[in-house]
Structure formats: structure tokens, C-alpha cells
Swiss-Prot record:
Domain Glutamine amidotransferase type-1 per the UniProt entry, residue ranges: 5-195
UniProt xrefs under HAMAP family: GMP_synthase
Subunit record text: Homodimer.
Protein name: GMP synthase [glutamine-hydrolyzing]
Primary role: Catalyzes the synthesis of GMP from XMP.
Residues passing through the membrane, by range: none
Class of enzymatic activity (EC top level): ligase
All copies of domain GMPS ATP-PPase, residue ranges: 196-388
Species assigned in the record: Clostridium botulinum (strain Alaska E43 / Type E3)
Keyword set includes Nucleotide-binding: yes
GO MF terms held by the record: ATP binding; GMP synthase activity
Documented EC number(s): 6.3.5.2
Binding of ATP, residues: S223, G224, G225, V226, D227, S228, S229
Catalytic activity: XMP + L-glutamine + ATP + H2O = GMP + L-glutamate + AMP + diphosphate + 2 H(+)
Amino acid sequence: MKRDLVLVIDFGGQYNQLIARRVRECNVYCEVHPYNLSVDEIKQMNPKGIIFTGGPNSVYGENSPLCDKAIFELGVPIFGICYGSQLMSHMLGGKVATAPVSEYGKTKVDVNIESKLFEGVSSSTICWMSHTDYIEKAPEGFKVIGKTPVCPVAAMECEDKNLYAVQFHPEVMHTEEGTKMLSNFVYNICGCTGDWKMDSFVEKTIEEVRQKVGNGKVLCALSGGVDSSVAAVLLSRAVGKQLTCVFVDHGLLRKNEGDEVEEIFGPNGQYDLNFIRVNAQERFYEKLAGIEEPEQKRKIIGEEFIRVFEEEAKKIGTVDYLVQGTIYPDVIESGLGKSAVIKSHHNVGGLPDYVDFKEIIEPLRLLFKDEVRKAGLELGIPEKLVFRQPFPGPGLGIRIIGEVTAEKVKIVQDADAIYREEIANAGIDKEIGQYFAALTNMRSVGVMGDERTYDYAIALRAVTTSDFMTAESADLPWEVLGKVTTRIVNEVKGVNRVMYDCTGKPPATIEFE
């Protein structure tokens, strides 16, 4: 049965993925597509509703993104947000102008609660504004349903044509009743049924993969991260021993992580698949010897990983399908925007040519990260794996400033394990977006017992974030930081100083390199 679909048309807004996530949280399936999506393509998709995103442009700008005016004649409900609201007004005969005063931040908006859009919403509600232009006059046939002292048309509707628009951002958490507004749009206005559920997605995807693969052989590069692990388990459910997972242990994983992956997926694990572990630590350490520049380290680690995987793939022989853990943000950022779970090798950029296979399978291609975790739980994957901390592809190679050596890897592994253990013991691990220890390239003088030391400094990082695009330094309790510090300097040989990184993103990145 075909599911309900809401389209998010992207006009360059920074919150486009967030809008889609909020709609999906309402149990309605949603896709993000570029603003130049044709009316014919939209008709083929048969959406229940359309949302126009915000964007940095003015509708009067020379190169500002516009949509085909025919979209308003499709009879499909449309919800314009920020730039999307101005675009709707501009294209339908309203007047958009530069606001006398820019509105930015939390703003009290008076709304008409008789509108379907604001059903169950307070008549005066806090919303997040971020605009310099505004709708000065609504188009003919539209009714003003929201205003502020600065913005005379903070919200408008043409109920007969199911066209709605707001100047603020209902998708951000600062708009206190924004989720309710989006829910009203998809249910009260679009008539969606709420048929996007993870159990049905998992069941449907398993059946699709099973039908596609038949008796074919499937190969998966397993990193032990959330995406590749969920993809592997899903494929295992579909085709069992026809799946071979290759796990390349490059020696740059967190403490005991390689053994944990083997315990879960290996011969004594709970999944019906073939598992190959390649212990390639020495190869990677040799390649990284003397290399200090971060991008060079990344490149070496990536290229060596490909070589190792290639060698193992050749031993396996011909495979019919290659599994990738692509998730929906990757699809959006690539500009592809299509929703097929399985697509041919030649239609995908950047795939390895050294593996002889017919097609690629991307079972998580439709899911956001939080949905991947839900799928993992639905598949019965242990929580410790499903909620594992984000970990970069180059691993500890970019959490060690400067040259990577086996000695340095052990130092950062031990320090990081202590840090993660104490965060969990304090019961705050679910409150922090990401946390880890990094080894600086700095040595300093210290005193241990009666002896002078000259050892490394460890940097602790912890951030809170909803999207990893921006982040704030986490306000960790001093008691926890003190305990972590005491344990690291006493238990980790080669460290005599611990520092806490208080920098947000921007200006810093979350990782050190």
C-alpha cells in the first residue's frame, strides 16, 4: 500500500532537514526536494501536502529561487514558511517589502485560533522569527491569521485553496507550539493518516530486499557504527548467510571496540551472516608513521581501508550486491532526492569499482539518524550499539593531534574509556550529544609523587546539539570532571594533565582534526 507523502520544497533554508524530521515525528512520511522540482514530477509523486522552506534570499533578488506558479493550481495543500511565505505572497499578487525593523529571535505572535492551522494553539504564542523582508499586504483572497507589532502578516491563509503561510519557523524548538502547527497542517489540512511507522518500514524493507536479492550474494563493509550495523542486521534478516560482512580493524577504534563488534556479529554472535574480521593495525600504523597533517592522515586512512577491503572482497569472489549505510541526510546533501531503496551501480557516484557487483543496496536511504536508531531497536539490536556515540571514519586518527603511533592510540583509548565510563556512571550520557577524549600534541611538566614528569595533556570534549551543524559546550558537573581527571592522570600512563574544551561550534568543529 502506498504511504502518504508530504513534500518539502527546499529554497535554501538551513532548517530544511529539520522540517522533514518534524513532519516524520508526526508519523507522516516526508521527502526534501530542490525548488526546481517540476510540476509534472510533483504530480507523479502524488503528495498529500507541500511545504515551502525558508531561505536566505529576497523574492526580489535577481537570482532568487522561484517555483512554477502552476504548483498553486494542483489542488494540493501548501504551507509556506518564512521565505516560502513571502514567495507565496509575491507569486499570487501580494506585496513583500523590507521590514522597518528586522525580527530575529523569540517573538510573541497573535494568531487566529479559528484557523485549522492554529487549532489547539494559544491565541498569543511564542514563535521564532528570522527575517528582514516581510509580507506587507496579503494576496487577494487571503485572510490574515497572525500578526506582530512589526509584522502585519505574520500568518495568512486562503482556506478555499488550502494555502497557508507563516513568517516564523514552526519547525524550531524555540517556536513553542510549532509541532502542533505542523501536525495541524498534515492532519487537519492535508488529511494524512499517520502511516509512517518504523515497524512497518522494517518489515517492508526486509521483504523488498529479499525479493530483490533472491539467491544472490551480498557484501557489506561493517564499521561497527550505528548505520552500518543496522544495515547489516536488516540484510541479515532478509537473506541470512547470503550476506558477508567485512570488518576492517584499523587499530584506531575505541578501547575494546573491535572485540565488541566481533562479539555481536561474529561466529558466536546472534546474527545469521558470514563475518570476516581483518586485523590490519600494523598496516595502518606503518602508513601513518611520520604524518602529522590532518587531511593527509584522513586520506591515508581512507585509501588504506579501501585497499584492505578490496583484498578481502577479491578473496570472496563475485558478489551480486554491495550494501551501503547511506542515510537520508546524505541523499539530501547530494541533491539526488530520490527515494528508491535499491538502485543500480552506475547511477551512484563514488562507489568502489574494484568490487565486481551488479547493484547497490541502501536499506536506510529513507531514514534520518534518529530513525536509524529506532529501526535498530525494532530489529532487536542491543541499546549499547544503537546509541553508540558518533565516531568519525578515520577513528582515533583524528583524535590524536600530530603523528599517530601505537603508544598514542593506547593512551587516548584508555583516557576515552574512563571518560565514557564516568559520564555513564553519572547518568548524563543521554543528555550529551557527543563526548570523547583527544590526545593533544602538547607535553607539559608535572609532579607525580616526588618525581618530575614531562607527559601529554588530554583534552576532554562534550557538546550538546540537535543536528551537529551547530553545538554548544556541555556544562558538565565539576564533580564528574574532577573524577575523570583524577582517574586519567592516575590510571593512564603518559598523561599528567587534563583539559576541558569549552568551545562551541562555530567557531570550532566538534572533532579536533
